Amino acid sequence: LVDRVRLSAHLAVPHGRDVLYIVEERAPGAPALVTGVDVRLPMHLTASGRAILAALPRPQVRALFPDRDAFVHRIEADSEIDRYSKLRAELDATLTRGYALERGSITPGFSSVAVPVLDHRQWPVAAIAVTFRDAEVPVDRLAGLALEVREACTRLSTRIHGRSR
């Protein structure tokens, strides 16, 4: 994936309300990212986490985020997800788009696109994401980039006896 898109990529798994990054491959010349191996970040703020959450049944998402205290705040922004209604709107947009998108919620000036990896029950067991400087990837390239990520997820899902969404 990194060789094809020439952007850094990572694999994250759900860990409570967080995602845990278990693999990171940095593109040549790309800057170090906060998403290194063994780093945990709030699921609702990351593209990887949003991809996983969007693939979960609504009651499961609600169980993870029962009230405003469940939402961690990282960067003050107008678009900050700080309540369930905002999270639900973002997850619905993710489902409509076909991929999760995070723009500056983790690191200002950087964005990520992610797709879930599903098991044989269609349950999200992980997500693959690519992260890039906003200036490197024009908005009209995001859908194509998401297709590349989806292909990687499909291959991984197949290897663990799942299928892609």
Place the predicted regions along the sequence by residue.
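Residue-level signature for short turns and capping positions that connect secondary-structure elements
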Residues: 26-27, 48, 135
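Generic beta-structure capping elements
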Residues: 22-25, 55, 67, 127-133
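Short, solvent-exposed recognition segments
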Residues: 30-106
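Residue-level recognition of conserved beta-strand positions in structured domain cores
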Residues: 13, 23-24, 35, 45, ...
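Extended hydrophobic
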Residues: 77-153
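Structural detector of well-ordered beta-strand residues that form the stable sheet scaffold
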Residues: 10-12, 42, 102, 127
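Residues embedded in well-ordered beta-strands
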Residues: 10, 20, 51-53, 111, ...
